Amino acid sequence: MEIQFSYESQDHHFLSDGETKIKIGEPATEEEMTGKIGTVTEESGSLEEDVPHDSRGKEFREFGEELNDQMLFRRRQYNCDECDQSFAWSTGLIRHQRTHWKPYECEECGKAFRMSSALVLHQRIHTGEKPYPCSWCIKSFSRSSDLIKHQRVHTGEKPYKCDECGKAFSQSSDLMIHQRIHTGEKPYQCSHCSKSFSQHSGMVKHLRIHTGEKPYMCNHCYKHFSQSSDLIKHQRIHTGEKPYKCDVCGKAFSQSSDRILHQRIHTGEKPYPCAQCNKSFSQNSDLIKHRRIHTGEKPYKCSECGKAFNQSSVLILHQRIHTGEKPYPCNQCTKSFSRLSDLINHQRIHTGEKPYPCSQCSKMFSRRSDLVKHYRIHTGEKPYECDKCGKTFSQSSNLILHQRIHTGEKPYPCNSCSKSFSRGSDLIKHQRVHTGEKPYTCNLCSKSFSQSSDLTKHQRVHSGEKPYHCSSCNKAFRQSSDLILHHRVHTGERPYACTQCPRSFSQKSDLIKHQRIHTGEKPYKCMCGKAFSQCSAFTLHQRIHTGEKPYPCAQCGKSFSQRSDLVNHQRVHADQKLQM
């Protein structure tokens, strides 16, 4: 018996004995199989129906063995020219060969594909064709698989469940990514550094840090972004879109992450606890910043002056001291600011808005930070401690200023003279000595002041307000500094000692005046050449030149240049009354 292969097409192979064919890869019909066995028995010299059962089985087995031999031989006929892999069928070889070449090319962009189906899907990018519409909403999709995934948004179906924690997902890819949380698997490694990622998209985004690639451009301002999600968020600045609304207070946000953080104000949730102390935070970024208080880490260094910071945002703000950049202008006046928060706070001067009320008293504040600071008056909390002397403070800024007493640091130099200051606010106040600027004007008498605190004190002259009361004698004062000085009358405290003699003073200004006796310094000089050690003496002397007599007598109208002269004069009227 001789069985041979014959071919009718590239993809269909037949076994043949010259008369009957059996198609390989498909079940043979009963007629074909009977005919094939019949042919074998005819060649052996007897008819099929006369062959005993055992003999027929033997013939069939022999036929099967020869078939297997022929098929093994046939498998060796489909070899890949590129890599020497062998295939049983030509279709397998054809599919394999497409791993070496891509025969289906897009006429629009030249991109090539291994499969015609992949080309069809790709061409829909150019044509915009989306033949799979959702029956629930107006969305359409270019692939049926995308439609199936989308429909789970409407049905809520989550057929892919995690065996570890029971969490369910609408897509198998999401489950696979989630499972890497449990396994710790990070199969996508950066070729530039040692970082690995659980998602391919995470690695692609990370690679743009190294390459600097920003493929997503805003068509309003031409700003570029490394991630499409960042572009979408940015575009909401132009459109004003705020699609994420708080269901408690109705406040809307341009980003879902901002809404999540906002909702924690209502819930009080602080899911990020510090392992070093008992503080918790509503944001992970706040916890990371807070930890640096414990570790002392300051990873952000200024390239201009070498100063280091524990937050990148603080470094950016600091660098604007060097550059002078003030990118936030006020649309109500000519002022500009280096920080957005400073602009927002400033604009409340124009609007009068005070959105932060104290729950303990009736006070309201234009800044949240001012409310937090104020609230510590009620609680007595002083969370910031000096590691040099143990003194505690209710505000971190006060601790920083205090620490400069120990370090002697004065980081704010005046560019008009040689003076330096430990506080930026002190430098600003000092610079007004050089510029003569007096930006704070009284709305009752139009008098102007270089400092807001001086205006506040002055306005109490008009209002008669004396908010600072002495606990010993109930005397009231307009200024807290006056109350402190007054307290020393009761306590006898004289904290300012002269280094040249044993005298002490209750006021620093009195010590400075006294020290001029020892040094001979007379800093107040008149145009006539005469000099004085005290400002008050200089003022009195100038009245000789100006003729000013600001102290009039209420009885006779006579005026005097000195108050003491008026007091002496008034005694004349008092004596006259006694004589009468």
Curated annotation (Swiss-Prot):
ZnF (C2H2-type) ranges: 78-100, 104-126, 132-154, 160-182, 188-210, 216-238, 244-266, 272-294, 300-322, 328-350, 356-378, 384-406, 412-434, 440-462, 468-490, 496-518, 524-545, 551-573
Q: In which tissues is it expressed?
A: Selectively expressed in adult testis.
Checking SUPFAM superfamilies in the record gives:
beta-beta-alpha zinc fingers (SSF57667)
Extract the Gene3D superfamilies matched here: Classic Zinc Finger
InterPro entries according to UniProt? C2H2-ZF_domain-containing (IPR050636), Znf_C2H2_sf (IPR036236), Znf_C2H2_type (IPR013087)
Which keywords appear in this protein's UniProt record, sorted alphabetically? Answer: Activator, Developmental protein, Differentiation, DNA-binding, Metal-binding, Nucleus, Repeat, Spermatogenesis, Transcription, Transcription regulation, Zinc, Zinc-finger
On the tree of life, the source organism's domain of life is: Eukaryota
Q: Name one GO molecular function term.
A: DNA binding
- Give an example GO biological process: negative regulation of T-helper 2 cell differentiation
Q: Where would you say this protein principally sits, based on its record? A: nucleus
One cellular component term (GO) for this entry is:
nucleus
Indicate where this protein resides in the cell: Nucleus
Protein name stated in the entry: Zinc finger protein 271
Q: What is the lineage of its organism?
A: Eukaryota, Metazoa, Chordata, Craniata, Vertebrata
